[in-house]
From Swiss-Prot:
Residues 139-165, 177-214, 369-618 are annotated as: Disordered. Component of the ESCRT-0 complex composed of HSE1 and VPS27. This is Class E vacuolar protein-sorting machinery protein HSE1. Residues 162-181 form the UIM domain. Gene3D superfamilies: 1.20.5.1940, 1.25.40.90, SH3 Domains. Residues 16-145 form the VHS domain. It comes from the Eukaryota. Component of the ESCRT-0 complex which is the sorting receptor for ubiquitinated cargo proteins at the multivesicular body (MVB).
Length: 618
């Protein structure tokens, strides 16, 4: 009969602020707005329903109610503004903000919404109650409103120097304290620490880090407000988080690490934490020891309760032992919860550190494998190619020359210089083979070496064939061999025209040195034999490279093997070619093998010391 009249907005407001919602449901919120506009008392009834929801102990319900009130203020006109600025609604929000059991996020949201409404209602003097309530809330709770972020200005050189000086001073003080600390001093300071601990409960609220403080003397800070990053590289944290300080980045921004994440944060959002002293560390160790000491009592209590239950005993409160064990173990529960939170945070930090280390190791191994799979790049230049009959490049580095380059001749190259007497064949221990040019060819001229750049001690001499390359001359080449395996050219193995006894046996300028005479024979006496006049053609051509085999001196008793009748037929006719004009027409005496001489060339006599008819056999 005297029951209060029900509010028609209770159901729709409860539906829009349900604690099971995962986010604001704007469909339900707009339904409340439409219903408020359809009734004359809708604004008053809706605010009354929201005051009831603000008294709910669930933080989500309180946050959804504040969001609903903000939507009504923007969509329901001046009548809703008057109800929101009423004494009843503002007092309800102040009670909620000053309640110590209220969640910090709810308090911050109340301060935020009251600030927005104060600005919105500032043009109407009848709505000044909201502004007064907002100023009162700011005065009573200065830490509710997050400050504005400072500007990111670069640290000057003087600030860097100051930070370094503070770091050196802190290190010196730490070393001094570690050396001067003694167990007796620790015991003497114990009562003072206990007194300080008792008086610390009445300490004032923590203050943010003062501007200008350097990161050299600060290792940890505690967050005073929630911080949401607005730019890349900023560190997100919640109020109460402990952040490890790494370094100073900007003047009022430090770099820190929290739960494996690294970023910068503003100094006015955190407070400085002192490093734990030795007494604090000992106290933490003592607390852990007390908790672990109760493990045996907890296990004993479980065993007694299990036995009592299986035996069908009466009320457990009658058992004094069970009651005593229960109360003794119940005292460690707050300490146990604190240790669980402490080591859970450490476990998360170590887990994230391990994940970072694993990632770094994988990146390093992949980088190492990639570098090993690529072939090493040569640090020197490759040998430039060059063509035939061309000298090597001047910048090419080869082996030092061991001897001057040999003279090279080719067909059609002209006669050698007049200042040098040609040698047929070259003077040496191992005369090389000689090739007879075709009839009518000009005598090849000697190619004089062209002056080039200064000799390089590692350059390849001209005229030598580089290893793995081809000769630079088109002249045919053969290797000198011993007399027992020298090939015999059957095409030129017929007897030449008759020769007088005094005809020379070697070309112009050929002299058998005394040191090269065959063993058992005296050295040659007299002047060297003279060759044909300079105008006469030379049938010999010097090869471009010296012989590579050592040839023993020719043996005058070495003769070609006799021609066997059953051998291959000769490839050339056995008759002598027609004698050239001016040559003797007498028949050739019977003799051994003689080299072929072209027409117009004076026949050669047996070499000096050659032993008669045997001659020099190749």
């Amino acid at each position: 009969m005297f029951r209060a009249q029900s509010n028609i907005f209770d159901d729709v407001v409860v539906k829009a602020t349900d604690e099971n919602l995962t986010s604001e449901n704007w469909e339900y919120i707009l339904d409340v707005c439409d219903k408020v506009g359809s009734s004359d008392t809708g604004a008053k009834d809706a605010v009354a329903a929201m005051i009831k929801r603000l008294a709910h102990r669930n933080a989500n319900v309180q946050l959804y109610t504040l969001e609903l009130a903000n939507a009504l203020s923007q969509n329901c006109g001046i009548q809703m503004h008057k109800e929101l600025a009423s004494r009843s609604f503002t007092d309800a929000m102040l009670r909620l903000a000053n309640d110590r059991n209220t969640h910090q996020a709810v308090k911050a949201k109340i301060l935020e919404r009251m600030g927005e409404w104060s600005e919105m209602f500032s043009r109407d003097p009848d709505l000044g109650i909201m502004e007064g309530a907002y100023m009162k809330l700011k005065t009573q709770n200065p830490n509710l409103r997050a400050p504005s972020k400072p500007q990111k200005t670069q640290i000057s050189d003087s600030d860097r120097q100051k930070e370094e000086e503070e770091l050196q001073m802190a290190l010196a003080m730490s070393i001094k304290e570690s050396k001067g600390a003694t167990p007796s001093a620790a015991k003497a300071n114990a009562p003072q620490e206990s007194n300080a601990g008792s008086s610390s409960q009445a300490a004032p609220a923590p203050q943010p880090v003062q501007p200008g403080t350097t990161a050299a003397t600060v290792s940890r800070v505690r967050a005073l407000f929630d911080f949401q990053p607005s730019e890349p590289g900023e560190l997100q944290f919640k109020k109460g988080d402990i952040i490890a300080v790494l370094e100073s980045v900007y003047k009022d921004w430090w770099k820190g690490s929290l739960r494996g994440n690294t970023g910068i944060f503003p100094l006015n959002y955190v407070e400085k934490l002192q490093d734990p002293t030795r007494e604090e560390l000992e106290k933490e160790a003592q607390t852990e020891a007390e908790v672990f000491a109760q493990i045996r009592n907890v296990e004993k209590l479980l065993a007694l309760l299990s036995t009592n239950t299986q035996a069908g005993g009466g009320d457990g409160r009658d058992n004094e032992e069970i009651t005593e064990l229960y109360h003794s173990t119940l005292a460690i529960r707050p300490k146990l919860i604190e240790l669980i939170g402490k080591y859970s945070q450490k476990k998360d930090d170590f887990t994230q550190l391990n994940e970072k280390f694993i990632k770094a190791r994988r990146d390093y191994e992949s980088l190492l494998e990639a570098s090993m799979s690529q072939p090493p790049q040569p640090s020197y230049g490759s040998r430039p190619p060059y063509g035939y009959n061309a000298p090597p490049p001047s910048n090419y580095t080869g082996y030092p020359p061991s001897s001057p380059p040999p003279q090279q001749y080719g067909y059609g190259a002209g006669a050698p210089p007049q200042g040098s007497a040609p040698q047929y064949p070259p003077v040496g221990a191992n005369p090389a083979f000689f090739m007879v040019p075709p009839a009518g060819e000009q005598r090849p001229q000697q190619q004089t070496p062209q002056p080039g750049p200064p000799s390089d001690p590692y350059s390849l001499p001209q005229g030598r064939v580089p290893i793995g390359g081809r000769p630079q001359s088109y002249a045919p080449q053969e290797l000198a061999t011993a007399h027992y395996d020298s090939p015999v050219d059957n095409r030129h193995s017929f007897a030449g025209p008759s020769q007088p006894q005094g005809a020379p046996s070697a070309p112009q300028g050929y002299e058998y040195p005394p040191s090269q005479a065959p063993p058992g024979y005296p050295p040659q006496q007299g002047a060297p034999l003279q060759g044909p006049p300079p105008g006469q053609q030379n049938p010999y051509e010097q090869i471009s490279s010296p012989p590579t085999h050592q040839q023993p001196p020719s043996d005058p008793y070495s003769q070609p093997p006799p021609q066997v009748g059953h051998g291959y037929p000769p490839q050339q006719p056995a008759h002598a070619p027609p004698a050239p004009p001016g040559a003797s027409s007498s028949p050739a005496p019977a003799q051994g093998y003689l080299p072929y001489r072209p027409p117009g060339q004076a026949p050669s006599a047996p070499p000096v010391g050659g032993g008669g008819d045997e001659g020099f056999y190749r």
